[in-house]
Amino acid sequence: MEQFHATTIVCVRRGNKVALGGDGQVTLGNIVIKGTARKIRRLYHDKILAGFAGATADAFTLQERFEAKLEKHQGHLMRAAVELTRDWRTDRVLRRLEAMLIVADAEHTLVLTGNGDVLEPEHGLAAIGSGGAYAQSAALALLRNTELSPQDIVKQSLEIAGDICIYTNQNHVIETLGE
């Protein structure tokens, strides 16, 4: 099965701005299948950003389920996330899905895991995927030591992760919310 675990997704929040970005590489084992995949989406009337890592079909399934929860709860991010992860834990089919999501709106950044966790990370910073630790480290250093915008921090942290992680490329998609 095609995997997105070999990817990098990073989200940075500073002030009233948030940026979420990901690379475009998709691998099957140790072969690059695609270099221009779009793993970042705008949801619920462009008010919510979502990025995913994991098995491709699983990630798309979770994204669709999350969108349905957003519609049901009129775009309330936390409620939709909690309800999705509740289903994820209790549904026999969903429980087998191997993917993670980072979702963000104007106020919150959340990481949704296959274990049914809803995590709100510290420092307004979250990263997932095989290059996630590299991107998170770079982004944290940039947050602490520069005045760069969230978009610029995401871009630079993805570049650094791509220089280190063989499963992350330099083809980035970055979406932003806020002024």
Swiss-Prot record:
Active site: 7
Catalytic activity: ATP-dependent cleavage of peptide bonds with broad specificity
Subcellular location: Cytoplasm
Covalent S-S links between cysteines: none
CDD domains: protease_HslV
Free-text activity regulation comment from the record: Allosterically activated by HslU binding.
Keywords of the record: Allosteric enzyme, Cytoplasm, Hydrolase, Metal-binding, Protease, Sodium, Stress response, Threonine protease
GO biological process: proteolysis involved in protein catabolic process
GO molecular function: metal ion binding; threonine-type endopeptidase activity
Binding locations of Na(+): 162, 165, 168
Similarity comment: family membership: Belongs to the peptidase T1B family. HslV subfamily.
PANTHER family: ATP-DEPENDENT PROTEASE SUBUNIT HSLV, METALLOPROTEASE TLDD
NCBIfam families associated with the record: ATP_dep_HslV, PRK05456.1
Cited function: Protease subunit of a proteasome-like degradation complex believed to be a general protein degrading machinery.
Protein name: ATP-dependent protease subunit HslV
Species annotation: Bordetella petrii (strain ATCC BAA-461 / DSM 12804 / CCUG 43448)
